[in-house]
Amino acid sequence: MAENQYYGTGRRKSSAARVFIKPGNGNIVINQRSLEQYFGRETARMVVRQPLELVDMVEKLDLYITVKGGGISGQAGAIRHGITRALMEYDESLRGELRKAGFVTRDARQVERKKVGLRKARRRPQFSKR
C-alpha cells in the first residue's frame, strides 16, 4: 500500500480492529464493505465517525479497516479506538483533544463470568422462605 499510511490497533470487549489511515476523500472500508453496508445501526456508524468529527478529518482521510470478534457494539468501539490511535500516529498534536473526549483510553469492561450455583454472573436462584 501507500508509504504515507498510518496504523492503529483498537480493542473493545472481545473485538479487535486494525485501522489504516491515509490522506484521501473520506472513504471508510470495513472488511471490504462500506460503513453503511457493514453497520446497519446508525448508532454504530456514529461511534465510528466520532474521532474523525472531533478533529475535523471526515473528508480528508481514507480508512481501511479489518475487524474481528464480538458483536456490533464491541466492533464499533474497537474501530473507534483504532482510529484514535492511528490519528495520534498521523498527528501527535491531536492527542490532547482526543484524550479529553475519552477516546484514547481502552474501555476495559469485560463480560463477567457466570458463577456455579447462580443463574447468571450475579443473578441468584429465586429464594423461597417456605
UniProtKB/Swiss-Prot annotation:
It holds the Pfam family Ribosomal_S9. InterPro entries: Ribosomal_Su5_D2-typ_SF (IPR020568), Ribosomal_uS9 (IPR000754), Ribosomal_uS9_bac/plastid (IPR023035), Ribosomal_uS9_CS (IPR020574), Ribsml_uS5_D2-typ_fold_subgr (IPR014721). Coiled coil: none annotated. Keywords: Ribonucleoprotein, Ribosomal protein. PROSITE patterns: RIBOSOMAL_S9 (PS00360). Belongs to the universal ribosomal protein uS9 family. This is Small ribosomal subunit protein uS9.
